[in-house]
């Protein structure tokens, strides 16, 4: 932690100042903590450690936070999100060293007080204005009376001596009037750190701690400060009495007599060997990360550009496979499409060393090491590494292959296999490839959605599924009721599906208790209940029906279940998609009857508007908005309160209201947008 002192001597007693916590390191280009501190309106404290800075926010002298956001350093947006967990309205100005859409979106979602890019013109002035507008100032006293002055002179002297003797850091005092600057005092901690007793140290110069591995430049820096009579801090390697080395952080300050002449030097020694070891380990990790970034940075940019230019799913698969397989970073790549109904993965595209794998089919119901790995990738939705011994297509002798799930929310579109000549792939590289898989999955979903929105007509399909094994049908029969779907929410972080339904059952808790007996139900609860109906939430570990419909690029617009039948209204963009939905449902379920099939003009419906808004909302914002709507939160009087809805999402009320407010803002903005 660094306390930055005001340089303006004009700051007078009673002047109003704003306590500013500067979280993170100073940007290489842009405003630094000292720049703000030069403004007499602010009292700036800089803390570079994330946890320590978060704890400091709670202190009463902190009125505002300036959080630096660096892509490979201090995560200022994550710090803002951490502050918002307990301080919904605390002023936090985020200063990113580089701004992209994700940083801006996260900052807005977390309700940042301000977002000031470090490289922007007059960034310091902009930050200062934001602070002054949002943070209250407090009055500073020039001097605080210390009760120790109530003691007698002798008692005060003894107390201070005891404090020096028992301080947890090494303390020495040297005589500055003697050319040799001999030590005249050491405390107990100095002996603990160095192993030297007072008899061995008093009268000696500090040089006895130095040795062959002591950095001479640091020693010169140390003695320059002493010669020029100013404070200094130096970290250097010193030797203990037993000859062992340790890293010693030495702080030296001159003490002046009544005439203004330096009479003594006080030194503070701290063994920072563990900290230095951690820093060296971190430096090694950063160097390793730099090598990784050099390798994949161009790849990620090219892949992102390719995904943006791709017009449809087929082009997405081709572009991503060609770039990864032939770009030079990896030996080869292939893209396998996942068919949830057939439980197979079929290689659709291959490039580089994997060329020739096109058409290979993996039956996930069969045996084999490669199949087992692919099963785990699909089920766990995590990247896994295989070797040539596993028999994965395109893996040469000695090569390794990363199998990356291509997913969007609860839907798995396929598996991306990346082959490399390096037998071991860094965990962080796997994380980056996993992110690439999610990005590709989102692009495929967008392509399917765009096709539905952009088409001249949309097709509405009505089907009836007479299958008592369907969850809602079976539950309706077991509880003698009916269900009407209000919302189905797929979580992008898990395979789970959150389903909200209404039921006229007079005992909704009995419905919940019955549902909890099903293997697929992870949790269930009554959200709100009235005399006429109740809203019930089911948290499902998976939903084969939802997976099938998502894979086909369709959207459920109505779902009704009774004890024998599930009535389903689905919207798709093309006749081909409609045929695929029907074929997939008939392959999956025994009795599927088509009861409606007609075209709609998108200009006559709000479908496109809803789809674009749905894609603009985050998962949490969409969930908060849907729950508020179906639970009667917007009615008067309210049928459900925000606290109750927050508990159903396992978040605090303030966070729920932030998500809801952001969703409402996007909804209203989309409605009034020209």
Swiss-Prot record:
The keyword Protein transport does not apply. Residues 230-284 form the PAC domain. Disulfide bonds: none annotated. This is Bacterioopsin transcriptional activator. Residues 285-454 form the GAF domain. GO terms for biological process: phosphorelay signal transduction system. It comes from the Archaea. Involved in activating bop (bacterioopsin) and brp gene expression at low-oxygen tension, which naturally occurs in stationary phase. Residues 156-229 form the PAS domain. The gene is bat. Gene3D superfamilies: 3.30.450.40, 3.40.50.2300, PAS domain. PANTHER family: BACTERIOOPSIN TRANSCRIPTIONAL ACTIVATOR (PTHR46175:SF4). The keyword Ribosomal protein does not apply. Residues 19-131 form the Response regulatory domain. Residues 617-668 form the HTH bat-type domain. Keywords: Activator, Transcription, Transcription regulation.
């Amino acid at each position: 932690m660094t306390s930055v002192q005001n340089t303006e001597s004009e700051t007078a007693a009673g002047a109003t100042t704003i306590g500013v916590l500067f979280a993170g390191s100073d940007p290489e280009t842009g405003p630094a903590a000292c720049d703000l501190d030069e403004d007499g309106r602010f009292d700036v404290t800089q803390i570079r450690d994330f946890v320590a800075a978060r704890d400091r926010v709670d202190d009463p002298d902190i009125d505002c936070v300036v959080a630096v956001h660096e892509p490979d350093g201090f995560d200022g947006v994550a710090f803002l999100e951490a502050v918002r967990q307990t301080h919904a309205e605390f002023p936090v100005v985020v200063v990113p060293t580089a701004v992209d859409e994700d940083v801006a979106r996260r900052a807005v979602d977390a309700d940042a007080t301000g977002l000031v890019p470090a490289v922007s013109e007059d960034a310091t002035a902009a930050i200062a204005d934001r602070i002054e507008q949002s943070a209250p100032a407090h009055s500073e006293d020039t001097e605080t009376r210390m009760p120790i002055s109530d003691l007698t002179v002798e008692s005060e002297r003894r107390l201070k001596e005891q404090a020096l003797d028992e301080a947890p850091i090494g303390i020495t005092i040297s005589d500055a009037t003697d050319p040799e600057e001999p030590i005249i005092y050491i405390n107990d901690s100095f002996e603990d750190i160095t192993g030297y007793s007072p008899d061995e140290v008093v009268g000696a110069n500090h040089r006895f701690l130095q040795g062959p591995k002591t950095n001479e430049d640091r020693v010169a820096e140390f003695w320059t400060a002493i010669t020029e009579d100013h404070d200094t801090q130096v970290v250097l390697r010193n030797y203990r009495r037993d000859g062992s080395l340790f890293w010693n952080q030495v702080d030296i300050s001159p003490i002046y007599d009544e005439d203004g002449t330096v009479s003594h030097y006080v030194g503070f020694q701290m063994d920072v060997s563990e900290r230095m070891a951690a820093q060296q380990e971190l430096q090694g990790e950063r160097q390793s990360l730099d090598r990784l970034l050099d390798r994949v940075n161009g790849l990620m940019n090219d892949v992102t550009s390719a995904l943006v230019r791709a017009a449809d799913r087929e082009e997405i698969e081709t572009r991503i496979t060609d770039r990864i397989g032939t770009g030079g970073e990896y030996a080869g790549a292939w893209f396998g499409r996942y068919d949830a109904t057939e439980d197979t993965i079929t290689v659709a595209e291959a490039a580089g060393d994997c060329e020739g794998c096109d058409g290979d089919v993996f039956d996930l119901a069969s045996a084999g090491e490669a199949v087992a790995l692919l099963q785990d990738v699909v089920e766990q939705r995590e990247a896994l590494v295989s070797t040539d011994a596993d028999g994965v297509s395109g893996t040469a002798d000695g090569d390794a292959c990363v199998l990356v799930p291509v997913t969007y929310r609860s839907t798995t579109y396929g598996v991306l296999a990346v082959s490399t000549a390096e037998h071991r792939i860094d965990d962080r590289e796997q994380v980056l490839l996993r992110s690439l898989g999610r990005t590709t999955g989102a692009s495929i979903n967008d392509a399917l959605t765009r096709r539905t929105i952009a088409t001249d007509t949309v097709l509405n399909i009505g089907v009836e599924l007479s299958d008592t094994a369907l969850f809602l049908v079976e539950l309706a029969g077991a509880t003698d009721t009916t269900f009407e779907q209000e919302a189905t929410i797929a979580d992008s972080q898990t395979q789970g599906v959150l389903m909200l339904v209404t039921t006229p059952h007079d005992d909704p808790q009995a419905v919940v208790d019955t549902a909890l007996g099903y293997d697929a139900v992870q949790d269930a609860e009554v959200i709100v209940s009235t005399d006429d109906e109740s809203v019930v939430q089911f948290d499902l570990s998976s939903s084969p029906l939802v997976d099938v419909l998502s894979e086909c690029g369709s959207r459920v617009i109505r779902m009704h279940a009774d004890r024998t039948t599930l009535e389903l209204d689905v919207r798709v963009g093309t006749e081909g998609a409609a045929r695929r939905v029907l074929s997939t449902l008939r392959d999956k379920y025994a009795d599927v009857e088509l009861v409606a099939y007609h075209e709609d003009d998108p200009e006559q419906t709000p479908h496109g508007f809803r789809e674009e808004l749905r894609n603009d909302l985050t998962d949490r914002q969409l969930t908060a908005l849907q729950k508020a709507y179906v639970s009667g939160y917007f009615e008067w009087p309210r049928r459900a309160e925000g606290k109750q809805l927050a508990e159903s999402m396992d978040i605090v009320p303030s966070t729920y209201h932030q998500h809801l407010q952001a969703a409402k803002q996007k909804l209203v903005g989309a409605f009034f947008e020209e």
